Amino acid sequence: MKTLVGKKTVAYNQNGEYFVNPLNKKIQKYEISILKEIAKKYDVDGIILDWLRFDDYKMDLSKSTRNAFKKKYGYDPITISFSTNNAKRRQWNSWRTSQLASYVKQASRSVRQTKKDILLGAFILPPEFTECGQDVGKFKSYIDVVLPMSYYKDWDFTPSWVYGKNSGILYDT
């Protein structure tokens, strides 16, 4: 996965770990083949998808992602001002969330063709983490289980952020 550092795109590295681009069609095809293999060869009740997201608005800025976005919108996303909330950044994020939803839809259909009764789920970040490019509303109809990542202590929130009666991660998702 590529991110923007200054004016250059570089491989995203988090504490020595590198991540694949969930929007890359070749990676999607490969990952779906693994999901189908698991569903076919192993006695599993379900499969949970993880890392259906990005760490920042500035991701993924690989050539394939940039070209796909530019083909649809006519400009290179590398030109977006990611540090401010603006129309182009919102357009970029909406496009990324739609692309991830399309991948979840394709994965769901492929796996369920292999094993009809398998449960599918996804780990999701809280709704206010918009920079991650997740919109569960766009893909919830393709999965059976949503697993909110509610690490309130890690992010300096109170338990009500997760368990609130009128708001909170569980209420909002």
Model segments located where?
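Active-site-adjacent "subsite" loops/lids of carbohydrate-active enzymes
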Residues: M1-K41
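Aromatic- and acidic-residue-enriched segments that line the glycan-binding/catalytic groove
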Residues: M1-Q14, W51-S83, K140
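Generic structural "secondary-structure junction" signal
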Residues: N21-P22, F54, K153
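Conserved, mostly hydrophobic/aromatic
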Residues: E31, I38, I47-D50, V111, ...
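A structural motif
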Residues: D43-V44, I143
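A structural signal for short, well-ordered beta-strand segments and their strand-loop junctions
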Residues: G46-D50, L119-A122
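Glycoside hydrolase catalytic-domain groove-lining segments
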Residues: K72-T173
